[in-house]
């Protein structure tokens, strides 16, 4: 069996969808426009340049606004094509829900892209940001989430300022407040209703859709809303139908089922005299984190064009069957817009690697269990073709358990325990070389042994801050070295962050057509491990990241790549300092410095050392929260 390269098993050709690739030297390159082959930059060279020019300290989050612009263009183009092929006469509006990533640079990049799109807010604070960024051009704004009177007034102000603002009714109690505040401002509100469907997508976010969803109105509540609006002579205000199946839908059949059910709501509302003009299918457009085109939780079994065609066709068929007008289709595809635009580059600060050690045979007077382990070890080379490979490992496991028991009651010394543990590793390593991946029965134990002997890479980042979904919901993200991808697989590794938490590990890695518990790696010097890239982290991760162990935001570089491959860092942020993080938890850095000074003054340190300590402590407060080289 030929040895595969890192490039072949990390699936970059699939999850990268043209934005990320590998050049002839084996370095990962970024291509903001997949059709412009010369518009590329090496991630390794970019990192080195930012370190040199901006004195950047790793980890650094690289963001590519051109990818955001291209994603807008691609999604708009897919729906334009689908509408043309279906003869669909209604419009289309791609809406960006800012909860996916509320950072100013993201919203401003989208607003300046020249691509048509709207904005969505799910809270009062988000609406304040949306109204500001909408600017002087008429912008379609969807207002979701639970609302108080202030939220409602802000939305109505947006309508008065010339925007097309839809207040989506999430619960019946909101409608009275909306009508009252609209009357005070002398404005006719644009209303939407979120229908709670029976249909539900599968996956990690399935609870956000379906009958048990946190949001939306049931069928009977929708009828009550219609009755209330009729009584108030405001039925014409209800113009938008909204539903949400769940985020990151992996199966295109779930999309088709949800669109079909919601189209029935559209038909029935028209029968009740409600002139629905906008059909908001919500989120759900998934991205393929795994790169294997399946319907798993972290993949999708459809393309962008298939998604658009499924949505447009489902709505158009209902309109055709019942002779209804084609509404404007709205999608809230935040993950599809932002996921690819950001990649975190981090350095490895330490490597723990298994190294076989030559051991001497136990002394004649050593306990019997040690001799039993030694017999297993010597038996491997003498009879490897005559016995089950598993039996050697099982014998070693039984003996090692006995060693631990005897050690705990004082029958074995620490040196004897250490000898036994090392010999057991030698046994497993030697037997592991004899297993064959082609044998289905061997695969489970091969995986177990790979995890046991994988290099442990201690990476200078916080999983909780930079990849919170990997910790919280077991989300898989593409991760691989950013150099050496044309080299054969020579090692396996597991990644551990620098927090003081045993949950700070990455447990799942892309491995060709499947998912493994270890990451394929090229051979590399233990003292010079490659930099690692964590890809597709542009959706939710920056916003959900938490301050575990007071690790803060990483440095961020916004990069624009020219057609000749030259790049410009248009914005650079150094990330949080230690003082920043302490202030978040109400620790005043000035007060801390005062207390340091008091302790030093009461010490017997020489004056020169006391002054040096104070300077170092002050520099520490102003330093990066992540580990720094001297």
Swiss-Prot record:
Catalysed reaction, written as an equation: L-arginine + H(+) = agmatine + CO2
Record carries keyword Lyase: yes
Modified residues (N6-(pyridoxal phosphate)lysine): 99
Residue sites binding substrate per the record: 279-289
Pathway where it operates: Amine and polyamine biosynthesis; agmatine biosynthesis; agmatine from L-arginine: step 1/1
Function, as annotated: Catalyzes the biosynthesis of agmatine from arginine.
Protein name as catalogued: Biosynthetic arginine decarboxylase
Organism of derivation: Neisseria meningitidis serogroup B (strain ATCC BAA-335 / MC58)
Gene: speA
């Amino acid at each position: 069996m030929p040895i595969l390269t890192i490039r072949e098993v990390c699936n970059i050709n699939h999850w990268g969808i043209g934005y990320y690739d590998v050049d002839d030297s084996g370095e990962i390159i970024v291509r903001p426009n997949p059709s412009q082959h010369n518009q590329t930059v090496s991630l390794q060279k970019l990192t080195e340049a930012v370190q040199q020019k901006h004195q950047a300290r790793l980890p650094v989050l690289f963001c590519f606004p051109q990818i955001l612009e291209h994603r807008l263009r691609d999604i708009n183009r897919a729906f334009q094509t689908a509408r043309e092929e279906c003869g669909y006469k209604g419009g289309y509006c791609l809406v960006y829900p800012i909860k996916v990533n509320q950072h100013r640079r993201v919203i401003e990049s989208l607003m300046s892209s020249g691509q048509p799109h709207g904005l969505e807010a799910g809270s009062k604070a988000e609406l304040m940001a949306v109204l500001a960024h909408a600017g002087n051009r008429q912008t379609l704004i969807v207002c979701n989430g639970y609302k108080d009177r202030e939220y409602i007034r802000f939305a109505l102000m947006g309508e008065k300022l010339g925007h097309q603002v839809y207040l989506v009714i999430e619960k019946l109690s909101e409608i009275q407040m909306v009508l009252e505040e609209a009357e005070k401002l002398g404005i006719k509100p644009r209303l939407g209703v979120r229908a709670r469907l029976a249909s539900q997508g599968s996956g990690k976010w399935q609870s956000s859709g379906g009958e048990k969803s946190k949001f939306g109105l049931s069928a009977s509540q929708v009828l009550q809303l219609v009755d209330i609006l009729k009584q108030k002579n405001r039925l014409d205000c209800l113009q938008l139908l909204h539903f949400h199946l769940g985020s990151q839908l992996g199966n295109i059949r779930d999309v088709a089922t949800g669109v079909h059910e919601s189209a029935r709501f559209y038909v029935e509302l028209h029968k009740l005299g409600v002139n629905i003009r906008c059909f908001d299918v919500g989120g759900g457009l998934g991205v393929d984190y795994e790169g294997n085109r399946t319907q798993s939780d972290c993949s999708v079994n459809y393309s962008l064009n298939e998604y658009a065609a499924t949505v447009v066709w489902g709505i158009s068929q209902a309109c055709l069957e019942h002779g209804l007008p084609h509404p404007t289709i709205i999608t809230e595809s935040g993950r599809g817009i932002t996921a690819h635009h950001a990649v975190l580059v981090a350095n490895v600060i330490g490597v723990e690697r298994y190294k076989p050690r030559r051991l001497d045979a136990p002394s004649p007077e050593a306990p019997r269990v040690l001799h039993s382990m030694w017999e297993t070890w010597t038996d491997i080379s003498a009879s490897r073709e005559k016995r089950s490979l598993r039996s050697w490992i099982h014998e070693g496991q039984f003996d090692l358990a006995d060693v631990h028991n005897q050690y705990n009651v004082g029958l074995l010394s620490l040196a004897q325990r250490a000898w036994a543990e090392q010999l057991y590793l030698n046994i497993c390593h030697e037997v592991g070389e004899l297993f064959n991946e082609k044998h289905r029965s061997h695969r489970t134990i091969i995986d177990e042994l790979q995890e046991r002997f994988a290099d442990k890479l201690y990476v200078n980042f916080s999983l909780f801050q930079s990849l919170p979904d990997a910790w919280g919901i077991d989300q898989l993200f593409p991760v691989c070295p950013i150099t050496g991808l044309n080299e054969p697989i020579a090692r396996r590794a597991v990644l551990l962050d620098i927090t003081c938490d045993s949950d700070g590990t990455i447990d799942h890695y892309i491995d060709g057509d499947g998912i493994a518990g270890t990451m394929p790696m090229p051979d590399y010097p233990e003292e010079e491990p490659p930099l690692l890239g964590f890809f597709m982290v542009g959706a939710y991760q920056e916003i959900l990241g938490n301050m575990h162990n007071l690790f803060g935001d990483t440095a961020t570089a916004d990069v624009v790549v020219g057609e000749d491959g030259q790049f410009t860092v248009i914005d650079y942020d150094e990330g949080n300092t230690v003082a920043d993080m302490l202030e978040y938890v109400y620790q005043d850095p000035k007060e801390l410095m005062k207390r340091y000074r008091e302790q030093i003054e009461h010490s017997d340190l020489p004056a020169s050392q006391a002054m040096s300590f104070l300077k170092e402590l002050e520099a520490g407060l102003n330093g990066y929260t992540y580990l720094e080289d001297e």
